[in-house]
Regions:
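Conserved phosphate/pyrophosphate-binding and hydrolysis machinery centered on Walker-type P-loop NTPases
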Residues: 42-49, 73, 96, 156, ...
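Phosphate-binding P-loop
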Residues: 44, 55-63, 72
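Short gly/ser/thr-rich secondary-structure transition/capping motifs
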Residues: 46-52, 119-123
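Conserved inter-motif catalytic segment of the P-loop NTP-binding fold
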Residues: 63, 71-74, 78-172
Length: 199
């Protein structure tokens, strides 16, 4: 028998969400000559923080995911709060390590008082995606990738599977919605990204 056949057996959520299955179900486009590839319609958007924009070659590109890593306590969260405060548009700051009250206190000290800066304390990837659906931000900050988890996976936050799947899903969301996503990754004393070095 030829052709595609359907399977009567259900696919488990873990298999359905795996990177390998997603690659099979959503194959990449064919190779094209570089001159045939469309250039992005939206150039890099300045963040409002000059030095940060210089490092990023002009700002954040819609549809991209940027990893900001550094040792704990170095000021990553503070820098990102300043960034959402300077961002021109709605931003969603997801803290998986602190409560919204703690983040608000730090934001107050930095002078970030805008109604279009949305705060969320969440550990679940599905909650984060639902908030993106509901609020349609142009910038999403996830602090940090090692502490969020996909509830469909049977592994702890920060594990190889969780970090891979959560990062992969955030990349998909960024591309599908043409939004900029910033992910925080902690660095160990040895200088490597905490958890699996898969990002």
């Amino acid at each position: 028998m030829t052709g595609v056949q359907t399977c009567a057996l259900p696919i488990s959520p873990v298999v359905a969400n795996s990177v390998a299955v997603n690659r099979l179900l959503n194959p990449s486009t064919a190779a094209l000559p570089i001159t045939a590839v469309e250039t992005p319609s939206a150039p890099a958007r300045p963040t409002g923080i000059g030095e940060f924009d210089r490092v990023l070659d002009g700002g954040l590109v819609p549809g991209s995911v940027t990893l900001l890593s550094g040792e704990p306590g170095i000021g990553k969260s503070t820098l990102l709060l300043q960034l959402v405060g300077a961002w021109s548009g709605t931003s969603l700051y997801v803290s998986a390590e602190e409560s919204t009250q703690q983040v608000r206190l730090r934001a107050e000290r930095l002078g970030v008082r805008r109604d279009d800066v949305l705060l969320m304390s969440a550990l679940s990837l599905s909650d984060i995606v639902a908030a993106i659906d509901k609020n349609v931000p142009s910038l999403v900050v996830v602090d940090s990738i090692q502490t969020i988890a996909d509830d469909a996976l049977d592994s702890a936050p920060g594990s190889v599977v969780q970090v891979r799947e959560c990062a992969f899903r955030l990349v998909q969301e960024a591309k599908a919605r043409s939004i900029a996503v910033l992910i925080v990754g902690h660095v160990t004393k040895e200088g490597s990204i905490a958890g699996p070095r898969l990002l």
